[in-house]
Amino acid sequence: MNRQQRATYVAAALVIAVWGASTLGMAQDCPELVGRWPYGPAYGVRASGSFAYFGSGAVLIIADVSEPAAPHVVGKVDLPGVVWGLAVSGDRAYVASGEGGLAVVDVSTPASATVVGGLDTAELALGVAVSSGYAYLVDRDAGLRIIDVSDPASPFEVSFVDTPGVAWGVAVAGSYAYVAAGFDGLRVIDISNPAMPSEVGAVDTPGEAIRVAVSGSHAYVADGLDGLQVIDVSTPGSPVRVGSLNLVGYAQAIDVSGAFAFVGLLEFGLRVIDISTPANPIQVGSMDTPGWACGVAVNGGSAFVADYFGGLRVIDVTDPGSPFEVGHIDTPGEAMDVVAAGSHAYVADRSSGLRVIDTSDPTSPVEVGHVATPGQPMGQPMGVAIAGSHAFVAAFHYGLRIIDVSSPASPFEVGSVDTPGEAYGVAVSGSYAYVADGNGGLRVIDVSSPGSPAEVGFIDPPGGAFDVAVAGGHAYTAAGDAGLLVIDVSSPSNPVLVGSLSTPGYAQGIDVSGAIAWVADDSGGLRVIDVSTPANPVEVSFFDEGYGRAYDVAVAGRFAYVANFSRLMVIDVSDVTEPVEAGSFDTPGLAWGVAASGEFIFVADYDAGVEIFQVCPEWPFADGFESGDTSAWSATVP
């Protein structure tokens, strides 16, 4: 080997080394989060003074409720996770933010509320109580975490108690913390020395202890299907169940004020219970809410209900026997699917219709339009596609809805077609919309006149249809436990099943690129299927590393982006026979849908809105070289 050959070899090795290093960097930097629209349903609420504090997805919202009939938002702050529970003490809000752990928010000036500190936790932060400089946080399977918040900017854990079951809720009274531990009932923790807590008592409850409130010598437990349970804790080491009240629905939330307990019953709204005789609680009032009552807080003569997709409901309870709503603030529901076109993203909000998000500045997306679909909350938009100036919404029990989005700020429905099944997904090709209609199979809709759509064909193969992609005269459907189905739609009025392939999981998302179909197969991960011969699809590889459940997939360039329950997975599929993980991002909600558009990836994150990511680079450098000048890689040695 002469000197020049040796130099060429060394230069080539350097390129390989740089590529390897860049690949590692990409695994860390890809996907790169660019922006968030983090709004979603309301789970938790607290009230203090003239303000109500509640969650909308991963946003803490502060509302002025000094006039209960006219509540209005005065501040908001984005958080690292979904707002499951919160406590307010002085000018700080302490938020149990799900995957984001504990967030400490300065609310002294509501209009400029700011996160001043936080602490990641091992599990899912579901509830929090604050007392004497400590936050007591329930962290799902990780029990009770005791966190020193004397310096709000630098909270740190001082101890924990690994309670049995699922730690859902917590209340603190005196020297004791009371933990609602799911099917393991109520646990009583001595916190007289926060650094050395210990469980001193427990009582089983007949249902699932979700939330707890303490007043005087009694703890009041929202016990799931078993309603309200009243526990005498006058002797904390020997708690005793002394009363109960069966309620219609699922007791999810509770607060106590005076002689009354206020219980949130999910879809059955608010119940007011007289607890003046703890051994004999009596329902005295009720009020159904439009959503699901997930959280409740009482302040003065008002009850504030975190009503899931119903937002914040303000209820006058000055007469506990006759509660009535006086005001509300709406929130979005669950982001099930997303598609992007131009400078807008379109979100299928299962609980409240189609939302239009301006993404012209992807670092700061803003909602600009919304249209409700019929039958809310049962309309349940599950999928969305865009063609021209129309959005096509798969609306579950309400079939296909066609929305004019020519003016994004004022979308309106122009046409619809009821379908016999449950419309989960939709794809548009030419003059036809193809609806994955669950048990109703694949429906083919002529949308050449969007105001007068008409079904022209259908096929009801085994397994149903839960998502669909159309390419080259074929519709490819994710068919649940039937796997992948290939349907010839060259004659839209006469679709014909021409090929199929069973998958090990439950096929519910699909994308097609070239001769490859990419199937999000739930527990089966990502399946890579050669469909170059549509009648004979063949799996060439798969990626299933136990990272959760693959719900949806979008392919852009050399990468497959998989909505994988709690994260976005990025899979390098440049060699389709050997997919390799290139990166991942833990999303604050449940990554349910994913779409690629231009240089961005959009994730529908269920109860945390939408995240926008930069498309991962095809190569470590845009042109394959570190600089734009290839001579920088010259191997010539004088």
What residue ranges belong to the model's regions?
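Extracellular carbohydrate-recognition regions
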Residues: 619-631
